[in-house]
């Protein structure tokens, strides 16, 4: 008979296939199975079923599927929130269960005393981060709250099992240590992290930060270019190549003319070069440089 973990993992794999094939046929039955199961945080983390359900929710156009998927994610988020609350209580030195009654009974009856075994955590985390120093600074506290909200975008933290509050505190602490104060440089640094972590077109960055592939120390000092999505990096790379090519073409000579009017300075002192940039049966591309202000443009 299949165990609970294997059963949930099987459902997760089937949901992943549906997302890949862009077909939600049978999804409701699988989601109902999950709804009927007593899922723990440990099972969520070990099977990553939360990510599978969330991916289906984002892709599906079936209202019933979306509604049930949202309901599951909401109920699982409560498990994570409860675990986070316990972790915060431990970090703040909250009251721990007293063992005085147990010690008293053992003192009365020494035979009942048994050697204690090391306790295993009931809800192990996949992604853990060291404790973050507490701050009383209002600006820093607000920045930590905003970073926490950014990390919680799209519920990826539920599936990964990350403590967003602790992670946000680590990121803010690294930014503060690098900058040294909460002036404009600090605020701009935090602002750029927020926009990139919340970017719907760049979920990969947020997931890498949540699972620890990108550390708080790294995300705290990364440039906008380094945080950009792979797609945007490719676009920037292509644009840089194109700009270099145009610059090189303009420097290799050309024909001076007064046939073109510069859109920037409105003068007609220009140099143009015609290059076959596409197939031989396509029109040539004309590159124009204004000799007065240096403005460059092209047309076919």
Swiss-Prot record:
Interacts with the basal transcription factor GTF2B. Interacts with REXO1. InterPro entries: TF_IIS-typ (IPR035100), TFIIS/CRSP70_N_sub (IPR003617), TFIIS/LEDGF_dom_sf (IPR035441), TFIIS_cen_dom (IPR003618), TFIIS_cen_dom_sf (IPR036575), TFIIS_N (IPR017923), TFSII (IPR006289), Znf_TFIIS (IPR001222). SUPFAM superfamilies: Conserved domain common to transcription factors TFIIS, elongin A, CRSP70, Elongation factor TFIIS domain 2, Zinc beta-ribbon. PANTHER family: TRANSCRIPTION ELONGATION FACTOR A PROTEIN 2 (PTHR11477:SF3), TRANSCRIPTION FACTOR S-II ZINC FINGER DOMAIN-CONTAINING PROTEIN (PTHR11477). GO terms for cellular component: nucleus. A zinc finger (TFIIS-type) spans 258-298. This is Transcription elongation factor A protein 2. NCBIfam families: TFSII. Zn(2+) binds at residues 262, 265, 290, 293. It comes from the Eukaryota. Residues 103-117 have a biased composition (Basic and acidic residues). GO terms for molecular function: DNA binding; zinc ion binding. Residues 6-83 form the TFIIS N-terminal domain. GO terms for biological process: regulation of transcription by RNA polymerase II; transcription elongation by RNA polymerase II. Keywords: DNA-binding, Isopeptide bond, Metal-binding, Nucleus, Phosphoprotein, Transcription, Transcription regulation, Ubl conjugation, Zinc, Zinc-finger. Residues 139-255 form the TFIIS central domain. Residues 84-131 are annotated as: Disordered. Necessary for efficient RNA polymerase II transcription elongation past template-encoded arresting sites. The arresting sites in DNA have the property of trapping a certain fraction of elongating RNA polymerases that pass through, resulting in locked ternary complexes. Cleavage of the nascent transcript by S-II allows the resumption of elongation from the new 3'-terminus. Gene3D superfamilies: 2.20.25.10, Conserved domain common to transcription factors TFIIS, elongin A, CRSP70, Transcription elongation factor S-II, central domain. There is a cross-link at residue 58 (Glycyl lysine isopeptide (Lys-Gly) (interchain with G-Cter in ubiquitin)). Belongs to the TFS-II family. The modification Phosphoserine is found at residues 60, 101. Its main location: nucleus.
């Amino acid at each position: 008979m299949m165990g609970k973990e294997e059963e949930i993992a099987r459902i997760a794999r089937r949901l992943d296939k549906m997302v890949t094939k862009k077909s939600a046929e049978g999804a409701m039955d699988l989601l109902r199975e999950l709804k009927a199961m007593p899922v723990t945080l440990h099972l969520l983390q070990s099977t990553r079923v939360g990510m599978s359900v969330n991916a289906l929710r984002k892709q599906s156009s079936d209202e019933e599927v979306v509604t049930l998927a949202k309901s599951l994610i909401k109920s699982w988020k409560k498990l994570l929130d409860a675990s986070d609350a316990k972790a915060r209580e431990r970090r703040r030195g909250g009251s721990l269960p007293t063992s005085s009654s147990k010690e008293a009974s053992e003192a009365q009856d020494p035979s009942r005393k048994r050697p204690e075994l090391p306790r295993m955590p009931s809800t192990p985390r996949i992604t853990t981060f060291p404790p973050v120093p507490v701050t009383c600074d209002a600006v820093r506290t607000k920045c930590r709250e905003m970073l926490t909200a950014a990390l919680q975008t799209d519920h990826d933290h539920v599936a990964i099992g990350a403590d967003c509050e602790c992670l946000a505190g680590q990121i803010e602490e690294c930014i503060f240590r690098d900058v040294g104060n909460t002036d404009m440089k600090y605020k701009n640094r935090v602002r750029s992290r927020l926009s990139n972590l919340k970017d719907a077109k760049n979920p990969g960055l947020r997931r890498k930060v949540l699972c620890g592939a990108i550390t708080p120390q790294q995300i705290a000092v990364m440039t906008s270019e380094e945080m950009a999505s792979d797609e945007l990096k490719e676009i920037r790379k292509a644009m840089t190549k194109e700009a270099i090519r145009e610059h090189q073409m303009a420097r290799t000579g050309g024909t001076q003319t007064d046939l073109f009017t510069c859109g920037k300075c409105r003068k007609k002192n220009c140099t143009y070069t015609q290059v076959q940039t596409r197939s031989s049966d396509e029109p040539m591309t004309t590159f124009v440089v204004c000799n007065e202000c240096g403005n460059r443009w092209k047309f076919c």
